[in-house]
Regions:
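Short acidic-glycine motifs
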Residues: 1-369
Length: 369
C-alpha cells in the first residue's frame, strides 16, 4: 500500500496594506522581472504595468537616444526620476537611460525594480512625477548564471499599408530580423567575503524599411525647364550649375504622382555590459562597486537612397558605495557616482566643394529646386 504524505508550503507575500509609508507604487522582484515577457527586453516597459502611468508615443517614435517617456498621473514627461543602486540614471533629454535602438537593456542584472507614483518619501527628490528605483544583482557563495537568446523575424508579420509591391520592392514585406542574446554569471571571489556578478546582453537587428517620398520629376531635370507649370522657376528656364550636383542625388519617380519608393535595411548593433563587486569588509562594514556601459551603433535612412546618418550612443554609469554600522540603530552610507553619455550623428557628404560648406557665423540660407 502506497504511503500518503501531505506538504504545507508557507510563502511570504507582500502585505496588501502598507502601514509604514504613505507612498503609492509597486515592487517587482527578480522572479517577476525574469518571467514577464518584454518586447525587445526593455525593462522600462515594466513601468506601464502600474496604474496612472501613460506612454507618450509622440516622444518615442523618433527613437533617437531618448529612452522611454511616460507620464505619471498627468505630470509632464520630464518630471520622472530614475535611479540605479541609489544613483541617477537619466539621459541628456530628461527621460530614462536609452540607446540609439530606443531600448534600455540589462534586465538580466536586475534584482529588484520599484516605481513610486505618489507621495514620495524624504529620501527622494528632484521630481514631481514618479520615482523608479533599480537594485542590481550581486554574487553569492554559489556560482550561478544564465544564457539566453530570443529571435524575432518577419515570417509571421502582416504587411502594412505602405509596403507597396513594385519592381523595386517585389517582396511581400521588408525583411526583419532581431536577435537578443546574452547571459550572466556570478559567484564568490573569496568565500563569505568578496563576490562578483557580470551581465552581458547583445542586440542585433536588421529592420527593413519601405520608404515612400515625393521626388523631383524627370521634366525638372532637363533644360530648358518646361513652361507647363510642372516646375517652378523665376524667369530663367535653366538649372544653376550649383544645383545640378544636388539634383543628381535625388532618384527618379517610380510611383505615380512623382513619388519614389525603395527598400532599405536599417542595421542596429547594441552591446550592454554590467559588472558588480561586493565586499564584506567586516561585520560592520560592507561596500560594492558597479559599472554599467551600453554602446549602440545604427545606420538610419533619411528618405532617399544614399541619404543616411551613422548614429552612435554610449552610456556609462559608475557607482561606488560603502555602508558602516555604528550601532544597532545608527548607520551611514557613503555613495559616489559618475555618469557619461556620448552621442554622435554623422552623414556622409554626397557632394563636395567649398561652395557646399557651411561657414561658421553665416546663415545656412534656403535652397529651392
Amino acid at each position: 500500500v502506497g504511503a500518503l504524505a501531505e506538504t504545507v508550503s508557507d510563502t511570504a507575500e507582500a502585505p496588501l496594506v502598507n502601514t509604514t509609508s504613505a507612498s503609492l507604487g509597486a515592487l517587482v522582484d527578480a522572479q517577476a522581472v525574469s518571467d514577464l515577457p518584454l518586447n525587445g527586453r526593455n525593462f522600462i516597459d515594466l513601468t506601464f504595468l502600474q496604474p496612472g502611468i501613460g506612454r507618450q508615443e509622440n516622444m518615442t517614435s523618433g527613437g533617437t537616444f531618448v529612452g522611454s517617456w511616460y507620464s505619471s498621473n498627468g505630470a509632464p514627461v520630464r518630471s520622472n526620476s530614475y535611479m540605479i543602486d541609489g544613483t541617477a540614471m537619466v539621459n541628456v533629454l530628461g527621460g530614462s537611460s536609452g540607446s540609439m535602438a530606443n531600448t534600455t537593456l540589462g534586465i538580466e542584472g536586475i534584482q529588484e525594480w520599484r516605481v513610486i507614483t505618489n507621495t514620495l518619501s524624504a529620501e527622494y527628490g528632484m521630481t514631481m512625477g514618479s520615482q523608479m528605483t533599480i537594485v542590481t544583482k550581486s554574487g553569492t557563495n554559489r556560482f550561478h548564471g544564465s544564457l539566453f537568446e530570443y529571435l524575432r523575424n518577419s515570417v509571421f508579420d502582416a504587411r502594412n499599408f505602405f509596403d507597396v509591391r513594385t519592381d523595386v520592392t517585389p517582396d511581400r514585406l521588408p525583411p526583419f530580423k532581431r536577435n537578443n542574446f546574452g547571459g550572466s554569471v556570478g559567484g564568490p571571489l573569496k568565500r563569505d567575503n568578496l563576490f562578483f556578478f557580470f551581465t552581458y546582453e547583445g542586440l542585433r537587428e536588421r529592420l527593413g524599411i519601405t520608404s515612400i517620398a515625393n521626388t523631383i520629376p524627370a521634366q525638372c531635370r532637363q533644360e530648358p525647364l518646361p513652361a507647363d507649370g510642372t516646375c517652378r522657376f523665376d524667369g530663367d528656364r535653366t538649372i544653376a550649375p550649383l544645383i545640378k550636383p544636388l539634383l543628381a542625388q535625388f532618384p527618379l519617380p517610380n510611383l505615380p504622382d512623382n513619388r519614389v519608393t525603395f527598400p532599405f535595411t536599417q542595421p542596429t548593433q547594441e552591446d550592454f555590459y554590467q559588472g558588480r563587486l561586493d565586499w564584506n569588509i567586516s561585520p560592520s562594514d560592507t561596500a560594492f562597486g558597479r559599472l554599467t556601459q551600453d554602446e549602440t551603433t545604427q545606420v538610419r535612412p533619411l528618405g532617399f537612397p544614399g541619404f543616411i546618418t551613422d548614429r552612435l550612443s554610449r552610456n556609462q554609469y559608475l557607482t561606488v558605495s560603502e555602508t558602516h554600522i555604528f550601532t544597532p540603530t545608527l548607520l551611514n552610507t557613503a555613495r559616489m557616482s559618475y555618469s557619461s553619455t556620448k552621442l554622435n550623428l554623422t552623414s556622409p557628404a554626397l557632394v563636395s566643394g567649398p561652395e557646399y560648406d557651411f561657414v561658421p557665423g553665416r546663415g545656412m540660407g534656403l535652397v529651392n529646386i
